[in-house]
Curated annotation (Swiss-Prot):
The keyword Zinc does not apply. It holds the Pfam family NEDD4_Bsd2. PANTHER family: NEDD4 FAMILY INTERACTING PROTEIN, NEDD4 FAMILY INTERACTING PROTEIN 1/2. Its main location: endoplasmic reticulum. It comes from Saccharomyces cerevisiae (strain ATCC 204508 / S288c). It is a multi-pass membrane protein. Residues 1-71 are annotated as: Disordered. This is Metal homeostatis protein BSD2. Present with 3070 molecules/cell in log phase SD medium. Required for homeostasis of heavy metal ions such as cadmium, cobalt and copper. Controls metal ion transport and prevents metal hyperaccumulation by negatively regulating the SMF1 and SMF2 metal transport systems. Under manganese-replete conditions facilitates trafficking of SMF1 and SMF2 metal transporters to the vacuole where they are degraded.
Amino acid sequence: MPEQELLIGQEMNTLHAGSSTDGINVGNAGRTRDTQTGVEGETEIGSDEEDSIEDEGSSSGGNSTTERLVPHQLREQAARHIGKIGRHFNILDRLFKKRTQQSSDIQQGAMFDGVFSNLSAKPDTTETEGNNEQDIPPTYDEAAADMAPSYYGMDLNNSDIYYDEICIEGLPVGNIANLLWNIIVSTSFQFIGFLITYILHTSHAAKQGSRFGLGLTFIGYGYSMIPNDVTSKVGKNKSLNRMELEDPNEFDDVRLNSQSTTQDKFESHLNHGLDEEKQNIPWLAVFVAFLGLFITLKSIYDYIQVKKLEKKYLNQSQNQA
């Protein structure tokens, strides 16, 4: 029995020793594995750090080269211009933005009442609709039946340059002095005087005076076209007295009271055509003279009509007063 117990004790010791050796071996193996993984991790970390350092170096080198070639401000300006050009040519974004803005504006203003939302008393829309119906313009027949007033075309605004004068068709009537002065200027300078007085007229009297002067100019031109008869100085249907010389070679010594001479009474019956041409008056002269006469009469008639209108308006204003 004691021998068996000794054998069992030895076997147990051997088992414990084997297990301890196995544990030591396992621990050693784990330690070796940990050391191997640590070394591998360190090698990997080192390689990553080297790669990052290389990348940083390459990027820093690239940035330094780009900064040397292109300045930073120029790159920013170029980026801004490119962005502006892109926004300018981006048509789709513009269309969508406009649509969204329109829809948002409609939605925002649809539920509000404008400036009257903060007021307790708001205007009634029914009254405005009734007033609009009452302010309907008249029909064509009603407007045609309404005659123009008697003072139509008359301007009584005293703030204008024509103070206290009645304006007809935008011009004051004027007086006789303006009429005579423009007649004198238009007649004296003929066409140039007519242009100056007609363009610069400020009244009906000045206008009609310039036209009257033009008519007198035409009458003068028509009269100047009529030919003059030389024999009219002696008298109509009379011929000049001619004397007959005894010696034709002594014509230089002829005196009035030197000798008695005989009158030459020879008359030719041939038609030389001189008197017939002088007696005929050209039709152009007649036309120009009649044109001038018509212009003068028309100017006087127009001025008289304007004066009658002025008198009529003055009488109406006095009756109303």
